[in-house]
Structure formats: structure tokens, C-alpha cells
């Protein structure tokens, strides 16, 4: 059965790909882009190095614009990022019957609540899988065993998640993204860990 995994090139979505691949799913890594900035390069590189099929899906830039409006209003990114994630899942559920992502137990954003997951699955007759039952310590330990990981301060070149195009649009509108986004480290999968 084919599964579309929302893919940023990070360790969480990479781990989800490995788990589902080993369970026999036909894994297709999917990176979303809105045409504002080609944020897909890190994900494409990571997917290639891991040997997974990768697809970029371009969506209407209005989704990004609506999210940026929310972020400007809130002066904080959470609601805007969650809006994008919910919208992307709704759109992908028209094409895929199984959708997954790397959201984990401690994640706050992007994340669906339990009732939102049930609603999505029931309304669209799909399956939605994530890492909700797994905590960051387990994900870090497992990822460290499997992947070569690069860690860097978040910027538009370190990840392929929604944040990157949001940052570009905010900067074009004259906003200092460092005042809106809390500083954080992005982990990107470079490839499989080599046996020593």
C-alpha cells in the first residue's frame, strides 16, 4: 500500500519513512512547496541519499499568504504553521489513502489533536500515521543509530519544512523573522550512518 510521508529531510520524517518501509509500505516522500522559494533542496538530497522516492507537490501560494497573515497578527508562528499543515493534509487526502508525517509526542506545532485526526480519517476515508507515541529521546537514539545527521541553526537552507517559505515571505514584507521565530536547531538527515 502506498503511503505519502510529508518530508522535510529531518530525522523525524526520515525515521517514519524507515519504519513504514520496513513494515512493507510503498513509501513516497512528499515535500510541499508554494513557489515562493525552492526550499525543497535539503529534502530532495536527503531522500536521494536514503534511497526513497521523492515528490515535490506545489500548492497554491494563497495558503502560504493566509498563514503569514496569521503569523503577523499573532507575532508568533504556531497558528500559521498549523494552518498550513492542516490544509496540506486535507489536500493530500484527496490523492492518497495513507498519509504520514514525523510529528512526535512532544511536538506542539504542527500537530493535529486526536479529534482532528479522527475527523480527517472519517471524512476522507484515509489513514493518518505519525510518531505521537514516540518521544524525542527515543527518536534521537534511534535516529543516531540509523542516520548521519547534520545540526544547524534554523535558516532557509537547512530544512524543507513549511517554516522556510514563511521566513522568505515575511522578510519580503519587511519583518525580522528572528523576532517572530524562536531560535532553534534543525536536524537534517545527510544519509545512512556508515558502519565503522
Task: Tell me the role of every PLM-derived stretch.
Residues 1-5, 9-196:
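Nucleotide-activated chemistry modules centered on ATP-dependent adenylation/adenylyltransferase
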Amino acid at each position: 500500500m502506498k503511503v505519502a510521508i510529508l518530508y522535510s529531510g529531518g530525522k523525524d520524517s526520515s525515521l517514519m519513512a524507515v519504519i513504514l518501509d520496513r513494515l512493507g509500505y510503498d513509501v513516497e516522500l512528499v515535500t510541499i512547496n508554494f513557489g515562493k522559494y525552492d526550499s525543497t533542496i535539503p529534502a530532495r538530497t536527503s531522500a536521494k541519499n536514503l534511497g526513497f522516492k521523492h515528490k515535490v507537490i506545489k500548492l497554491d501560494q494563497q495558503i502560504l499568504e493566509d498563514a503569514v497573515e496569521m503569523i503577523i497578527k499573532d507575532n508568533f508562528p504556531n497558528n500559521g504553521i498549523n494552518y498550513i499543515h492542516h490544509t496540506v493534509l486535507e489536500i493530500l487526502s484527496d490523492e492518497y489513502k495513507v498519509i504520514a508525517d514525523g510529528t512526535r509526542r512532544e511536538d506542539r506545532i504542527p500537530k493535529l489533536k486526536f479529534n482532528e485526526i479522527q475527523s480527517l480519517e472519517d471524512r476522507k476515508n484515509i489513514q493518518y500515521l505519525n510518531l505521537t507515541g514516540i518521544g524525542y529521546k527515543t527518536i534521537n537514539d534511534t535516529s543516531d543509530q540509523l542516520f548521519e545527521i547534520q545540526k544547524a541553526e534554523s535558516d532557509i537552507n537547512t530544512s524543507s519544512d513549511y517554516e522556510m517559505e514563511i521566513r522568505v515571505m515575511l522578510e519580503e514584507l519587511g519583518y525580522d523573522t528572528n523576532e517572530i521565530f524562536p531560535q532553534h536547531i534543525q536536524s537534517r538527515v545527510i544519509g545512512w550512518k556508515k558502519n565503522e
